[in-house]
Amino acid sequence: TELVLLGDDPGLRVPAIRDWVSVPWGVVSLYETCTGPEDTREQRLDRYTRMRAMVAESLAGFAGRVAPWRAHERPLRLLGTSGTVTTLASLHLDLPQYDRRAVDGAIVPAPAMRAISERLSGMSVAERRGLPCIGRERADLVVAGCAILDAILDLWPAERLGVADRGIREGILRGLINVDGRPGAAGEGEKQ
């Protein structure tokens, strides 16, 4: 899990990276570290609360470093790539099955993401398996991803969250292709 604070400097063509952090918790490591019984809803919610606290503690130093920049800037824009945010967006869109074209570029209200996270955190693995767009392979791990997202939203409240399915590498590649400044250079006729 990586977080990057980009500057909004009007004179720059490409946003400047002001600070970044690589958090020691991804969904797998957080899920495996924060173990416990999950027989009841209360036990599942307790585990979720502990996961959020662990992530928040890991982000505290970064939050402190970026606070001075955040104090005088416009409202925060968050962008999540792949994994949990795309799963939550697909649930928000009420898709019958995952559809990358519908999810990529979606803008989801942050309160909706939080509500879905809260709902999933109280469900059993079997209940989550039955939801479209989660399935067997993510049913156990998705709650850890929800805890990471909720901890981020606790520290940096935003009205909405942009969702990208294509990932950061594709964005970097498109940026490099478009480095000469020609708007169509990233792929003539493609959705930008």
Label each residue range with its predicted role.
Residues 1-2:
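Acidic, divalent-metal-coordinating active-site segment for phosphoryl/phosphodiester hydrolysis
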Residues 5-192:
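Helical "lid/coupling" subdomains associated with nucleotide-phosphate turnover
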